[in-house]
Every structure is written in C-alpha cells, then in structure tokens.
Amino acid sequence: MPKTLIFGHKNPDTDTICSAIAYADLKGQLGVETEAVRLGEPNGETLYALEAFGVSTPRLIEKAANETDRVILVDHNERQQSVSDIDDVQVVEVIDHHRIANFETADPVYYRAEPVGCTATIIKKLYKEHGLDIPKPIAGLMLSAIISDSLLFKSPTCTEEDRQAAKELAEIAGVNAEEYGLNMLKAGADISDKTAGELLTMDAKAFAMGAATVEIAQVNTVDINDVLARQSELEKVITAKINDNGLDLFVFIITDILENDSVALVLGDKTAAFEQAFQTTLTNHTAVLKGVVSRKKQVVPPLTEAIANVN
C-alpha cells in the first residue's frame, strides 16, 4: 500500500506546513506510513520556524493521485483550497479548525474539527490522547503554528486551549514564546522583496459563498502604508485574477501585527456586500477595519451573510 500523504491548503501558512509535519510524526509513532507534503511555497515566517527548529521543508506536490490513493487533510477541508486532483483520491482523515464547506466523501472519514485558533492545538491534544511524546522540534513547530494563527495570542480566534497548548509546547521546545513569537512574526512581516503577485498569493484562500466565488488574501506587516504605496500595482494584479478565475470579489486584508488593525483593498462585482458586511464605504477601493485581524472569524462569516442578502 502506498504511503498516505498529509497536506494543508494551497498558498500554505505556518499552521498548514507545521501541522502536516507534526501529524506525520504522530502517525509515524503509531506505525502508519505517511509523508507531510506542501501545495505551495512556504512564507518567510514559516521558513524562520523550520530553520529555528532544524526541520526540513516538506516537498512540493502538484497532484496526489499519481503517487497515492489516500490523503489526510490538515488545516482545511474546502475542495477549492486543496490539491487539484482531490476528487481522484480518498480523503481518509481531516484535522481542521475552520468552517465545513464544499466537502463530501464517498466513504466514512475520521473528521476532527474543533473551534480553536489553530490546527496544531488539536494535534497537541491527539498526542496526549494517544499517550505519545512530542519531540522537541515538533513542539517548536506546533508552537510556531499557534503563534502564527493567533498573532501571538492577540487574535479573537485564540482560545484558552490554544494558550495552554502553547505554554506546554514552549516548555518542551525550550523557548520563550513571547520573545520567539515576536521574532517569527517580524520575519514573516518583512515583505520588502515581494512582488505584487507574491503579496496576493502568500496567504490566499478561495471561498464559495452561495453562488459567489470569493478570494480573500491576507498579509501581515509592521507598516500598512508600505503596502498601500503599491496599490496601483496591486489593483492591476487583482483585476487580472478576477478576470482569469471568474471571481465575484477579491478582498486583500493588510494587517498591522503591532496595532492589530487592518485595511482592506476590495475589488469585484460584490463590493456592495463587503460594505454591508462591515458597515463601511469603500474609498478608493479601501476601508479601514479596526480590530480586524482574523480572516476566519472576522471576515468570512459576515461577508458570507452579506453576500447572501445582497443581490
């Protein structure tokens, strides 16, 4: 039997990469042959974490069915966010912390989803449930994932379970979570060498919202104006993405990791739904979103509801 591949979503973030690696370690300790792989290039933040704990970057795959018939999804479940030939393989497990949408299987599946801030928090619990030890590098990667998804425990998605898991993982990894976390986030916020196209795909996800197709990209920075200075260039790339991919709306969330606020750059036919969702008026295609840092909890739910209500 070919080994089972474990991967997160396209345009991978730190949780997607690190949780795939961690879950592959857990399954290996249980005697199951798996391999963590990735569906895109890791960002600077993720590379910082991998280097800090001496772990190799998983290999890149474009398709899965040419080498296995069984896959495990972490940090996502929506098909449009997954490997391109997801319909040609059997999803045997899902470990996730997002909404469930556009997902079905022909066979029974082990599905573990919890309303926590990070997939790694769930995997930490699975190690405990199976009575397994967490290796130091794996603990460091799972800590990195929690710090990333919670913006160093400041995001509204962060739960007490996430904080407790991070505390225990930091002890195993032998690091100070606050100090290490800030350095990691700053590494990810250094986007000076990124093209407009790279900024818009570093952390982008497609969503089916009713009959509408929406893409929401997000980038972390320490100065929003540095990103907005490139607005004209960004809008050209966004317009091309809308036309090429048949999108109804593209939302680019630029998040200040120091102030915990965001600015959204919004284009497409459904901009009225965005304005309704956030009770705002777009000015030059942008809107300030005070206190908004989480795509999952603060952007997707109100936008999904608004699109359903706006013609």
UniProtKB/Swiss-Prot annotation:
Which pairs are disulfide-linked?
A: none
Q: Keywords assigned by UniProt?
A: Cytoplasm, Hydrolase, Manganese, Metal-binding
What's the cofactor? Mn(2+)
Q: How is the cofactor bound?
A: Binds 2 manganese ions per subunit.
Give me the residues that bind Mn(2+) 2, please. D15, D75, H97, D149
Q: Where in the cell is it found?
A: Cytoplasm
- UniProt-annotated binding residues for Mn(2+) 1: H9, D13, D75
Question: Which superkingdom heads the taxonomic lineage of this protein's source?
Answer: Bacteria
A single GO CC term for this protein reads:
cytoplasm
Q: Which GO terms describe its molecular function?
A: inorganic diphosphate phosphatase activity; manganese ion binding
Q: Which reaction does it catalyse?
A: diphosphate + H2O = 2 phosphate + H(+)
Enzyme's top EC category: hydrolase
Q: Give the EC number(s) under which this enzyme is classified.
A: 3.6.1.1
**HAMAP family assigned:** PPase_C (MF_00207)
Q: Which family does it belong to?
A: Belongs to the PPase class C family.
| Name of the featured protein | Probable manganese-dependent inorganic pyrophosphatase
List the source organism. Answer: Shouchella clausii (strain KSM-K16) (Alkalihalobacillus clausii)
